[in-house]
């Protein structure tokens, strides 16, 4: 009897066709529609739209907020991951659940909670507002919201790396007289490069597209606190479909580039 070799893959047009039928209306067609409508008025019209002060501010502000958020969460997320992975203490599991809560909480609820804390009538805001300190409806509030929403992504990327790092490396560094800072700088930090890169890309990408918390804490003020997603929403509400599509296409393209680098890095890591 002749036995057919199986290389671990199955060839069939039916499962692939079913998958494509599902993906086309759910993902591929909506994404294609953005670029089709964005270019519907021609290249000149497209360039004119994205050259407007409001559109350029929204795109630039989104990138700045995403960058600042990524840097801050890079520090906070790495510190939290180190504490949760290297120290044993009562309530560690509970604390681990708490720091990951932003993933489960609707972003609009996040925005509401920040307003109730830092807003003009908030628990803290009512004391600092009279002296001229008001983080809400300002860039500071937007950054606070994005830090809250994206914090688990950096933590989730760095913590597994620290858990896999053998304690013997740190102990060896201590035995030759290295300080905690030197051990972190020369032993731990180099090992975290991959986790920081992945967490940074995920944080940046999610910050770029954040809407729910941002719309609550920013006031959606043009040329002040309006991010690209808020600008797109405002233009759709005003009936400026071409304008909204043009900025949406730029934002989508930027997200695709980030995703490409993430996939490429992950693939190289698996191969190595």
Positions of the model-derived regions?
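Membrane-interfacial helix termini and adjacent extracytoplasmic/periplasmic loops
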Residues: 3-6, 43-51, 56, 91-92, ...
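Hydrophobic alpha-helical transmembrane segments of multipass integral membrane proteins
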Residues: 25, 60, 64-76, 80, ...
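Periplasmic/extracellular loop-to-transmembrane helix junction in inner-membrane transport proteins
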Residues: 6, 36-71, 86-87, 237-241
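Transmembrane alpha-helices
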Residues: 16-20, 101, 111, 148-150, ...
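Transmembrane-helix boundary motif in ABC transporter permease subunits
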Residues: 2-8, 44, 68-99, 112, ...
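Alpha-helical transmembrane segments of multi-pass integral membrane proteins
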Residues: 18-22, 32-33, 65-70, 81, ...
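Interhelical loop and adjacent transmembrane-helix boundary motif
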Residues: 7-12, 46, 53, 214-260
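C-terminal transmembrane helix and the adjacent membrane-cytosol boundary/short C-terminal tail
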Residues: 7-18, 26-29, 33-36, 91, ...
């Amino acid at each position: 009897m002749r036995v057919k070799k199986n290389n671990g893959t199955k060839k069939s047009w039916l499962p692939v066709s079913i998958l494509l039928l599902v993906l086309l209306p759910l993902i591929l067609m909506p994404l294609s529609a953005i670029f089709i409508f964005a270019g519907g008025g021609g290249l000149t019209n497209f360039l004119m739209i994205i050259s407007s002060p409001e559109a350029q501010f929204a795109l630039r502000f989104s990138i700045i907020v995403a960058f600042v958020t990524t840097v801050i969460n890079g520090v906070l997320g790495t510190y939290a991951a180190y504490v949760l992975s290297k120290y044993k203490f009562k309530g560690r599991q509970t604390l681990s659940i708490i720091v990951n809560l932003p993933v489960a909480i609707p972003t609009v609820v996040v925005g509401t909670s920040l307003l109730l804390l830092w807003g003009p009538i908030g628990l803290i805001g009512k004391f600092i507002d009279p002296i001229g300190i008001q983080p809400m409806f300002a860039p500071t509030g937007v950054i606070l919201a994005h830090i809250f929403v994206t914090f688990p992504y950096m933590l989730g990327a760095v913590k597994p790396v620290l858990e896999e790092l053998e304690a013997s490396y740190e102990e060896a560094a201590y035995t030759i007289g290295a300080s905690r800072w030197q051990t972190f700088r020369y032993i731990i930090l180099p090992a975290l490069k991959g986790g920081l890169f992945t967490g940074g890309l995920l944080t940046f990408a999610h910050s770029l597209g954040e809407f729910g918390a941002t719309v609550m804490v920013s006031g959606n003020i043009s040329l002040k606190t309006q991010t690209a997603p808020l600008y797109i929403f405002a233009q759709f509400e005003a009936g400026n479909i071409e304008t909204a599509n043009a900025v949406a296409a730029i934002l989508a393209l930027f997200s695709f580039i980030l995703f490409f680098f993430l996939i490429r890095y992950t693939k190289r890591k698996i191969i190595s």
